[in-house]
């Protein structure tokens, strides 16, 4: 390999440091490297042969002298594999003389040239991509956005006689998200959220109110006064389970994906939202509490209205049986047997245990019930999720130590707790 020829297949660079107790020159160092490693390793790793066949490159030496001592760096390009390169790097440390002087060589590192090249490729690709974006003409960007918008518009559906803008899943989803306008539906559709419906104005159509009573409903309103007005109207005629808002001063149609996901993740039960934000007038609050409690207890709606009139700022919990009858006492006595066990049981109509369950698997166990079951009793907390699946499976009683965040209780299900 000629002196001017560069090694083009370099995989690694061996970096070594040399210290000599005297003044030495570059040829002295190169000679010591070849001479003192000769015969040390097998013929396959002989430096002269490796250089002749192009498997190592030209040895580079940068050295300088000061105060009668010399120090510098040795760099050897290698196209050998990792193991062979490591052996070669270690062999340099056996050199103890350079020219007439005692010397010491220490391998500092073995650099992976390909990793450096990959990093260069990534950085350069970023620059090229950035330039592509910046150089794209406004007309091209508008054209791309028009195509994307057309695709979203094609997916948009309609709901009810009012032909309200809605996502394609509005007719099949068990949960819906109510927003203000068509632009909000389009924006959420862009992020893959398809169970939305728009009220199209401050006056909420009755069809939305009726739909909200059949589905688990989340109101997603703008973070301004308009959002509050729509929320008030929706609470007057509908049944809202959860509420969330865009950040203050922002509209749902302008939110980025992360903002949308955070807002939906942080939704809270309606009663808790009203108590925290205090955005309803007193009469509105009365109507809202009456509606939430009267939904499942219409015969006693007037009494419930009076009971909750002074509790506007307290979280509304599902009312459980206030008078402890014999059945309730029996259930509580049975529950005490499971206290601290982390277990529960599925009972038939005669209150005979048909299956013992682990609390951590309680949801799946109820979901997979195939035989007739009457009661589920367990050492844990009753959640809205358990209420929903128990109702679906025809369970008549859920018995546990307490309940949490239950906003919708089916008429066919009785909840008994120690609270």
Swiss-Prot record:
Q: How is the cofactor bound?
A: Binds two Mg(2+) per subunit.
Q: Where does Mg(2+) 2 bind?
A: 222, 224
Q: Return the Basic residues bias intervals.
A: 288-305
Q: Could you tell me which PROSITE patterns the record lists for this protein?
A: TOPRIM
The chemistry this enzyme catalyses reads:
ssDNA + n NTP = ssDNA/pppN(pN)n-1 hybrid + (n-1) diphosphate
Domain Toprim: start-end pairs: 174-260
GO function terms (MF aspect): DNA-directed RNA polymerase activity; metal ion binding; poly(A) binding
Enumerate the InterPro entries for this protein.
DnaG_primase, Primase_DnaG_arc, TOPRIM_DnaG/twinkle, TOPRIM_dom
Pfam entry (one): Toprim_4
UniProt keyword annotation of RNA-binding present: no
Q: What is its EC number?
A: 2.7.7.101
**A GO CC term assigned to this protein in UniProt:** cytoplasm
Q: Which gene encodes it?
A: dnaG
Identify the keywords attached in UniProt to this record, alphabetized.
DNA replication, DNA-directed RNA polymerase, Exosome, Magnesium, Metal-binding, Nucleotidyltransferase, Primosome, Transcription, Transferase
Q: Where is this region: Disordered?
A: 277-314
Q: Tell me the function of this protein.
A: RNA polymerase that catalyzes the synthesis of short RNA molecules used as primers for DNA polymerase during DNA replication. Also part of the exosome, which is a complex involved in RNA degradation. Acts as a poly(A)-binding protein that enhances the interaction between heteromeric, adenine-rich transcripts and the exosome.
Family stated for the protein in its record: Belongs to the archaeal DnaG primase family.
GO annotation, biological process? DNA replication, synthesis of primer
Tell me the organism.
Methanobrevibacter smithii (strain ATCC 35061 / DSM 861 / OCM 144 / PS)
Q: NCBIfam families from the xrefs? A: PRK04031.1-1
Q: Which cofactor does it need?
A: Mg(2+)
Where, if anywhere, are coiled coils annotated?
none
Matching SMART domains: TOPRIM
Q: What is this protein called?
A: DNA primase DnaG
């Amino acid at each position: 390999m000629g002196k001017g020829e560069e090694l083009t297949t370099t995989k690694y660079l061996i970096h070594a440091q040399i210290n000599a107790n005297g003044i030495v020159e570059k040829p002295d160092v190169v000679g010591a490297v070849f001479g003192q490693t000769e015969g040390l390793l097998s013929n396959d790793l002989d430096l002269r042969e490796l250089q002749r066949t192009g498997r190592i490159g030209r040895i580079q030496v940068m050295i300088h002298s000061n105060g009668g001592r010399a120090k510098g760096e040795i760099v050897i390009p290698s196209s050998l594999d990792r193991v062979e390169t490591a052996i070669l790097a270690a062999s340099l440390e056996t050199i103890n003389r350079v020219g007439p002087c005692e010397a010491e060589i220490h391998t500092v590192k073995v650099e992976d040239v390909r990793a450096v090249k990959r990093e260069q490729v990534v950085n350069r690709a970023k620059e090229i991509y950035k330039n592509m974006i910046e150089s794209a003409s406004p007309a091209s960007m508008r054209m791309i956005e028009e195509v994307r918008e057309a695709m979203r518009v094609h997916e948009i559906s309609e709901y009810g006689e009012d032909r309200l803008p809605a996502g394609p899943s509005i007719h099949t989803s068990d949960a819906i998200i109510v927003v203000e306008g068509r632009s909000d539906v389009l924006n959420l559709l862009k992020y893959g959220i398809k169970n939305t419906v728009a009220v199209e104005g401050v006056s909420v159509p009755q069809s939305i109110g009726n739909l909200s009573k059949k589905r688990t409903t989340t109101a997603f309103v703008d973070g301004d006064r308009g959002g509050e007005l729509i929320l008030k109207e929706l609470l007057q005629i509908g049944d809202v389970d959860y509420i969330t808002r865009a950040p203050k001063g922002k509209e749902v149609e302008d939110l980025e994906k992360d903002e949308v996901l955070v807002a939906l993740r942080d939704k809270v039960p309606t009663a808790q939202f009203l108590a925290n934000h205090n955005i309803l007038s007193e009469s509105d609050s009365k109507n809202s509490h009456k509606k939430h409690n009267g939904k499942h207890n219409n015969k006693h709606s007037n009494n419930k209205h009076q009971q909750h009139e002074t509790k506007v700022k307290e979280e509304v919990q599902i009312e459980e049986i206030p008078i402890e009858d014999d059945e309730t006492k029996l259930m509580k006595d049975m529950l005490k047997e499971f206290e601290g066990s982390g277990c529960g049981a599925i009972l038939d109509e005669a209150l005979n245990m048909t299956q013992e369950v682990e609390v951590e698997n309680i949801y799946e166990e109820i979901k997979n019930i195939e035989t007739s079951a009457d009661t589920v009793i367990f050492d844990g907390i009753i959640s809205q999720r358990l209420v929903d699946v128990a109702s679906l499976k025809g369970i008549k009683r859920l018995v546990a130590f307490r309940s949490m965040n239950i906003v919708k209780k089916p008429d066919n299900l009785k909840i008994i707790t120690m609270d």
